[in-house]
Amino acid sequence: MSLLDLNALNDLPKVERILALAETNAKLEKLDAEGRVAWALENLPGEYALSSSFGIQAAVSLHLVNTIRPDIPVILTDTGYLFPETYQFIDELADKLKLNLKVYRAEQSAAWQEARYGKLWEQGVEGIEKYNDINKVEPMNRALEELNVKTWFAGLRREQSGSRASLPVLGIQRGVFKVLPIIDWDNRTVYQYLQKHGLKYHPLWDQGYLSVGDTHTTRKWEPGMAEEETRFFGLKRECGLHEG
């Protein structure tokens, strides 16, 4: 088994790290999504995990990765402010796909946070970033550490936003390998995969939502809006999990 040296790559400056992975990424771009997952499981170190927000198209990556690697830990960072439909979707997919779901939450409850800080999501970019650090980033860091994750799969796609448009298949984030098997998929490919495997979009898709996060920072799509403008009042696209 040929494993890339994670420790050596982590010691490199970011630009050199990207260059070191460039040849591998050129090969991965030519593989299909299933091939990328299989390659990662063969060539990258474990433990392995898949993160999911259980958003609009979440069933794709959950089905894809879990089919190839049954019982892979699926990390959900639960803010306590998800839509009721999201919690129902989580239950449905966890049962249907027999997911090994690992739920992580902030150390402070949602009510305690509001008492201490107020409604952070109403406090501009700085407030949103603090909220995301508490409810998304810290729980994810804890999950990666407790589960001893060395290779992290995620369902990001370049088409989703400008901030994701140049992401490679393979990168390093938070000190671990990060693999994005469906990074180059468009909406049509997503639809075809869901249809082929009898999977559904998130329930709020039919109500006009293109992207779903917390109730207080998610808007329905309206004509003229980009998908990324439906989250965080258009102030930012990422919740912090996929930055850095």
Curated annotation (Swiss-Prot):
<dbReference type="InterPro" id="IPR002500">
    <property type="entry name" value="PAPS_reduct_dom"/>
</dbReference>
<dbReference type="GO" id="GO:0019379">
    <property type="term" value="P:sulfate assimilation, phosphoadenylyl sulfate reduction by phosphoadenylyl-sulfate reductase (thioredoxin)"/>
</dbReference>
<dbReference type="InterPro" id="IPR004511">
    <property type="entry name" value="PAPS/APS_Rdtase"/>
</dbReference>
<keyword id="KW-0963">Cytoplasm</keyword>
<dbReference type="GO" id="GO:0070814">
    <property type="term" value="P:hydrogen sulfide biosynthetic process"/>
</dbReference>
<dbReference type="InterPro" id="IPR011800">
    <property type="entry name" value="PAPS_reductase_CysH"/>
</dbReference>
<dbReference type="GO" id="GO:0005737">
    <property type="term" value="C:cytoplasm"/>
</dbReference>
<dbReference type="Pfam" id="PF01507">
    <property type="entry name" value="PAPS_reduct"/>
</dbReference>
<dbReference type="GO" id="GO:0004604">
    <property type="term" value="F:phosphoadenylyl-sulfate reductase (thioredoxin) activity"/>
</dbReference>
<feature type="active site" description="Nucleophile; cysteine thiosulfonate intermediate">
    <location>
        <position position="239"/>
    </location>
</feature>
<keyword id="KW-0560">Oxidoreductase</keyword>
<dbReference type="InterPro" id="IPR014729">
    <property type="entry name" value="Rossmann-like_a/b/a_fold"/>
</dbReference>
<protein>
    <recommendedName>
        <fullName>Phosphoadenosine 5'-phosphosulfate reductase</fullName>
        <ecNumber>1.8.4.8</ecNumber>
    </recommendedName>
</protein>
<comment type="similarity">
    <text>Belongs to the PAPS reductase family. CysH subfamily.</text>
</comment>
<comment type="function">
    <text>Catalyzes the formation of sulfite from phosphoadenosine 5'-phosphosulfate (PAPS) using thioredoxin as an electron donor.</text>
</comment>
<comment type="pathway">
    <text>Sulfur metabolism; hydrogen sulfide biosynthesis; sulfite from sulfate: step 3/3.</text>
</comment>
